Amino acid sequence: MGVVVVSVVTLLDQRNALPRTSADASPALWSFLLRQCRILASEPLGTPVVVRPANLRRLAEPLMDLPKFTRPIVRTRSCRCPPNTTTGLFAEDDPLESIEILDAPACFRLLHQERPGPHRLYHLWVVGAADLCVPFFEYAQKTRLGFRFIATKTNDAWVGEPWPLPDRFLPERTVSWTPFPAAPNHPLENLLSRYEYQYGVVVPGDRERSCLRWLRSLVAPHNKPRPASSRPHPATHPTQRPCFTCMGRPEIPDEPSWQTGDDDPQNPGPPLAVGDEWPPSSHVCYPITNL
């Protein structure tokens, strides 16, 4: 049992930036990319296992014909607000509809470990935005794992936030690949012909020489940590990005701290308005975007 090939399929803009989350790119682009991935996954390079974000369920119909254990999902939300699993283009999978894993590196380790029984070969596909792909990029660099990089490069900016991809995560050389025609009446049918389709192989860098690693180990204990800044720095890693509503309001406590007029802890009442201003109501993560 083992992974013979890893392919990362994602979107890029002209500045080599990924959409930070799935909701930061057009759902029509994801629909096209997932269909391309399903067609490419039929190549005879091992059993295909496609990892995608949970919030692409409505756009992942081409993948649902795969066996359940070969189409795992990752819930990439970093918010504490309740998920939207019923409505909207970016609704998530229902419970038990798909196998859930922690992240793409966890899926790779699960497939690559030794197990008793017949030896099976897998082709791992990672399809998504920066919140899904970047943790795998970091894992691949740490473990010196090479992978195929398949991207659709658009001419337009993302609907939401971009995440610039460091050069170490990009292939040094790329060639073009020809996508299969878009489905009839696709919203981006005219634009898809203007996009670039890049394919390359990301090769891990050479290991540091043993002498250099030894010197680093000697100097590391004597490095003084920098004083902490008084201003909190915003989280820039794509896996730590909350939704826009969460970023615009203070953290909501888990339990209400108000009491009723009778001070009955078993029957807390609703928060009272101060003047003409009502307290903020609870919200649901629901990314709104346009096709």
Swiss-Prot record:
Keyword tags: Acetylation, Activation of host NF-kappa-B by virus, Host cytoplasm, Host nucleus, Host-virus interaction, Virion
Locations listed in the record: Virion; Host cytoplasm; Host cell surface; Host nucleus
Source taxon at top rank: Viruses
Gene Ontology process terms (BP): symbiont-mediated activation of host NF-kappaB cascade
Function of the protein: Plays a role in the activation of the host NF-kappa-B pathway by interacting with and thus activating the component MAP3K7.
Family statement drawn from the similarity comment of this UniProt entry: Belongs to the herpesviridae HHV-1 US2 protein family.
Quaternary structure note: Interacts with host KRT18. Interacts with host MAP3K7; this interaction induces host NF-kappa-B pathway.
Name by which UniProt lists this protein: Protein US2
